[in-house]
A protein has these predicted regions:
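Non-heme iron-sulfur electron-transfer modules
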Residues: 1-7, 30-58, 79-108, 386-394
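Short, intrinsically disordered, charge-biased short linear motifs at domain edges
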Residues: 3-15, 53-55, 60-63, 208-210, ...
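Residue-level recognition of alpha-helix initiation/capping sites
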Residues: 9, 19, 57, 67, ...
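Cysteine-centered iron-sulfur cluster-binding motifs in ferredoxin-type domains/subunits
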Residues: 12-31, 56, 60-80, 317
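Alpha-helix capping and helix-loop boundary segments enriched in small/acidic/polar residues
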Residues: 16, 35-39, 227-233
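N-terminal glycine-rich anion-binding loops that anchor highly charged ligand groups
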Residues: 22-26, 36-40, 214-216
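A short glycine/small-residue-enriched secondary-structure motif
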Residues: 40-50, 60-67, 220, 319-321
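Iron-sulfur cluster-binding electron-transfer modules in prokaryotic oxidoreductases
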Residues: 82-402
């Protein structure tokens, strides 16, 4: 049996901050679902401590089950840095624990496909054909989940991937309207660029309408968030590529919560690289969610009435990982006629099928600032026979501006 190595191992000192008070338990989706101590944040911290001596298969299983929602970080009265602990633990498992061959192949497939926009564009017609053929329904059948559970899960969450939308390119420059208030670079992303390019376009249009000069460079192809959250070493190279591509801009705006949380954490990710540590810290300080930039600046373009009742879902990597809760709400409240409804248990991750609280609001649409949340909520509401459209906040603001 192997144990954690000395390369960025999770720090015992950070583990010692946990006093086992249990405030994290009701906010942890896996603990709420299964009720197992080792599927809670404090239980996983115990396992991390054990990993310094021995990495066992049960340890890996319980760590893998963590959704990385960081709701425990928000709830913890002792300020335990669980986000740093889990980020340092996952790479240890990838280096020091041999996963079964099918699982290794699955993970490699995900990384080699989803972090490459060109490959995603090539796959878009296949995804669209699969959607038309009802693959999502087939994937929910017990036999499919038994034979290929991971692929069945992906099929069930597949986005609407019209080839025309996937192939559309975003203009590289959106000039500010009126007097310029600032200049920003918009991260296009990988999945966001291909399957949610309309969100990138809406983001750029709102920023430009409110006085920002928006640059949308083709590079980087991916910020590395997917691999970072999975503990894959490829995240380091993608982080360096992202810094090199965008560090010349004063502000880097992001409209995908998972990407933003990863990029704001580059300083921690590259802390042991003397050639990149300083650059990473300076870069991370310039990363802002698009809603932060717009809420701080205040509206300039006229907002026209948009009569809708919408429920706002807090994306975990925005609310918990970045601490950004009010800016998206503020932007939505600026839209005349838009009724914003707050769901119960806002802190619970939609990854644990947490959509009932959204349906209970009676809203006619859901608003979420992360593509993963959009896919998850869309899939689950459809599965329950109560399909709701899911928008990024800036899609509705853009529609209001016209």
């Amino acid at each position: 049996m192997s144990a954690f190595d000395d390369i960025r191992a999770p720090q015992i000192e950070l583990m010692d901050d946990c006093v086992h008070c249990g405030f994290c338990l009701p906010t942890c989706p896996t603990y709420v679902l299964w009720g197992e101590e080792m599927d809670s944040p404090r239980g996983r911290i115990v396992l991390m401590r054990q990993g310094h001596e021995e990495i066992s298969a049960p340890l890996v299983e319980h760590i893998d089950r963590c959704l990385g929602c960081m709701a425990c970080v928000t709830a913890c009265p002792s300020g335990v840095k669980y986000d740093k602990l889990i980020e340092d633990t996952r790479p240890q498992l990838e280096r020091n624990f041999e996963r079964p061959a099918p699982e290794r192949a699955y993970r490699r497939l995900v990384f080699e496909l989803f972090t490459h926009p060109g490959r995603l564009r090539a796959a878009a017609p296949l995804v669209a054909a699969a959607k038309r053929a009802g693959v999502a329904g087939i994937a929910r059948r017990p036999r499919a989940r038994r034979l290929a559970p991971r692929l069945a899960s992906i099929a069930g969450l597949a986005p609407d991937a019209s080839p025309a939308r996937a192939l559309k390119r975003l203009p590289r420059h959106f000039p500010a309207r009126g007097e310029k208030r600032g200049s920003v670079a918009l991260l296009q992303g990988c999945v966001q660029r291909v399957f949610f390019g309309h969100v990138n376009e809406a983001t750029a249009c709102v920023l430009a309408a409110d006085g920002f000069d928006v640059h949308a460079p083709r590079l980087p192809r991916c910020c590395g968030a997917l691999q970072l959250h999975a503990g894959d070493a490829g995240a380091l190279e993608l982080a360096r590529d992202t810094i090199a591509a965008l560090e010349g801009y004063d502000t880097i705006v992001v409209n995908a919560a998972g990407c933003g949380s990863a990029m704001k954490d580059y300083g921690h990710l590259l802390r042991d690289d003397p050639d990149w540590e300083g650059r990473a810290e300076r870069f991370a300080a310039k990363v802002r969610d698009a809603t932060e930039v717009l809420a701080e600046a205040g509206p300039r373009a006229e907002r026209r009435p948009l009569p809708m009742r919408v429920a706002y879902h807090d994306a975990c990597h925005l609310a918990h990982a970045q601490g950004v809760r009010e800016p998206p709400r503020e932007l939505l409240r600026q839209v005349p006629g838009l009724e914003l409804i707050e769901p119960a248990e806002w802190e619970i991750c939609c990854g644990s099928a947490g959509v009932y609280n959204l349906l209970d609001t009676g809203a006619e649409a859901v608003v979420a600032a992360n593509p993963g949340c959009v896919l998850q909520i869309t899939a689950h509401t459809s599965r329950l026979g109560r399909a709701l459209p899911v928008y990024h906040p800036l899609e509705l603001v853009a529609r209001s501006i016209g």
